[in-house]
Amino acid sequence: MLYVTVGALPLYVVRWHYGPLPTTLLETLVIITVVLYVVARWRDGVRRPLSTPYDIPIVLLLVAGAISVVVAKDHRGALGLYRAYFIEPVAVFYVAVDLLREADRRYRLVLSFAAGSSIFAILNLAVFAQAFVQHNVNVGAAPTALYTDANPVAMYLEPAVALAAGMILFGGTRRLKLIGVGWLALAGSAFLVMFSKGGYLAIAALVLVAIVTAPRWRLFLVGATVLATAGATQIPLVMQRLATIPPSLNGREAIFGATIDMIRSHPIFGLGLGGFTYQFRGVIPEIYPHNIWLTFWVEIGLLGVAAFAAIFLMLQWEGWRAWPSVEPTQRPWLWGALGGLILWFVHGLVDSPYWKNDMSVEFWVMAALIFTVARSALQVTGRRGVQASPQARD
């Protein structure tokens, strides 16, 4: 059931009510996944989740979220956000870190994500193609399927792009590389036609990571980057979008300034979940401050942003520390998950990844991949060290 949930992340847009309680198809899948897991483990005699190094910052994050529900003006709305962005995604994390201890399950999970994100990419490419044929493409509000805004589409697809690239760079079989090529062609194309400037910046950062970590591909990546950059300058729609960078920077400066003023007034607890409101240029309502760290601070306070930063940095530290010891078959997943979070870190300088139903679950699935691959690599290294020690030989 975890595979179905991961493949169906965009279906949070399917909404209905159980009486007065709103829900989504994604939330229903998450609840079914967690309940089935708990029942199965209870029958096996397991009464508590696996322990991870992230338990303390996760508890602090959940505490910060709970406080933000109390602080918020709309307690009911804040509780819904708390449930969708924190409680349920964290539950998925603990399910995943148990189930993904086996390598073949990681493979199936990534394939499920590939299938779901590829279908989503095809839908968005079809909508774009229709608009393009009709000469109706607005690069400032790119045509999308299911979602109402292009930036969330781009941010959802970024981990997919990273995992697909990881399969190409580090896949040990021809089949795996071909799957990566097909996945990258679909997810990458849909990502590009969202015309997300923050996304383009994030991809540039991922290319730098690839150049450093994949020396066999270094010359190819440098050459491909040069050709892609030169080619992009010949695409009118791309250049039209890049021409809006100066006013976008001015807009971000205004939003950041307003957010910082709000934080100064509420530095400890923030405004509570759903508390941020800003009329951009007096017309456009903004629900988040277009920066991942400002968003965490203004929504769930100083404790929340500190806890999330700790989790993020710990994931990167553990993942890259284990990288030299990771088995070749697991490198695509570790590199892709780490790369996906790097994409969000860079894109998060100018937008608010994580803060959607799909992306919050997506983050914790990437976290589970990083943890399980890194931990298995470190355990194998430890066993090898024991076997090689003089005491072991004696």
Residues covered by each model-derived region:
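Transmembrane alpha-helices of multi-pass inner-membrane enzymes
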Residues: 31-36, 218-219, 338-345, 353-394
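Long extracytoplasmic/lumenal interhelical loops at the membrane interface
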Residues: 134, 237-300, 321-325
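Juxtamembrane membrane-interface segments at transmembrane alpha-helix termini
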Residues: 15-18, 40, 93-98, 122-127, ...
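Interfacial transmembrane-helix termini
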Residues: 9-31, 45-54, 63-89, 98-108, ...
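Alpha-helical transmembrane segments of multi-pass inner-membrane proteins
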Residues: 33-34, 62-70, 87, 91, ...
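A cytosolic-side transmembrane-helix exit/cap motif
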Residues: 79-80, 99-105, 129-137, 220-228, ...
